[in-house]
Amino acid sequence: MAKILYGNEVALKIKEDLNLRIGKLKEKNIIPKLAILRMGNKPDDIAYERSIIKSCEKLNIETKVEELNEDILEEDFLKLMESLNNEKETHGILVFRPYPKHLNENIINSSIALNKDVDCMHPLNLERIFEGDLNGFMPCTPEAVIEILKYYDIDLKGKNIVIINRSMVVGKPLSMMVLSHNATVTICHSKTIDLPSITKRADIVVTAIGKAKLIKEEYFNEDSIVIDVSINVDENGKLCGDVDFENVKEKVGAITPVPKGVGSVTTTLLLKHIVDAAERNS
């Protein structure tokens, strides 16, 4: 049976360090604070918002939610962003995506202060990653993949890595991050021909396509390390990933579960970035 790469163990280790750092900030009368901007009332957004708030509360990180109409004018959004950028007590800003179609994504992302951009949405922060500089904020989900591999002592140097996702949220930044660790990377997507023949040759496969249990054992070899980023709902209403876990777990070397995998680390890294920002801005 495959080694199960539990993300909650990784998250727990990060939180232990955060507790110490937050305690030191409190001694200076600094309370880390996150501003969340949500446009509309999509159930997925509201659920994610509640999850973030709950996680923040456990570590004594303050949150402020700005509930905005989906038809908000770009001018009004930018005024709000300017106000949050100038608030000394607000250390991190997170804007839920995707944005309403009438808003210019590049303009919105560029409006976030670089030192408060805790999910690396600003083009200049992303550009830094594409230049190989991993010292600042990184997108939380790709960073979670790296942290899980690091925790379980999986060296990326020389590894062949296949990423099934080409978005700016996961696939593209993650590809640059693993390149910085001297891996060889292949990006696949919905138009890739004969995907199993590509993934089967890889040492590590990262999938983030959002299709419940689509990926079966024929995509992997017996030594494959499988990182399942997606959180889907199966036909029985249960959370699952892109990979059919029960079908695959006996056939590969290691695999992350869903839940208790990448998602738990992603949220914890958001908290870490808020604390990082509070320390830098203090």
UniProtKB/Swiss-Prot annotation:
Task: Give the CC-aspect GO terms.
Answer: cytosol
The record's listing under Pfam families reads: THF_DHG_CYH, THF_DHG_CYH_C
Keywords attached to this Swiss-Prot or TrEMBL record, sorted alphabetically, are: Amino-acid biosynthesis, Histidine biosynthesis, Hydrolase, Methionine biosynthesis, Multifunctional enzyme, NADP, One-carbon metabolism, Oxidoreductase, Purine biosynthesis
Q: For NADP(+), which residues are the binding ones?
A: 165-167, 190, 231
Single GO term (MF): methenyltetrahydrofolate cyclohydrolase activity
Q: Which reaction does it catalyse?
A: (6R)-5,10-methylene-5,6,7,8-tetrahydrofolate + NADP(+) = (6R)-5,10-methenyltetrahydrofolate + NADPH; (6R)-5,10-methenyltetrahydrofolate + H2O = (6R)-10-formyltetrahydrofolate + H(+)
What is known about what this protein does? Catalyzes the oxidation of 5,10-methylenetetrahydrofolate to 5,10-methenyltetrahydrofolate and then the hydrolysis of 5,10-methenyltetrahydrofolate to 10-formyltetrahydrofolate.
Protein's name according to its UniProt entry: Bifunctional protein FolD
UniProt organism field: Clostridium botulinum (strain 657 / Type Ba4)
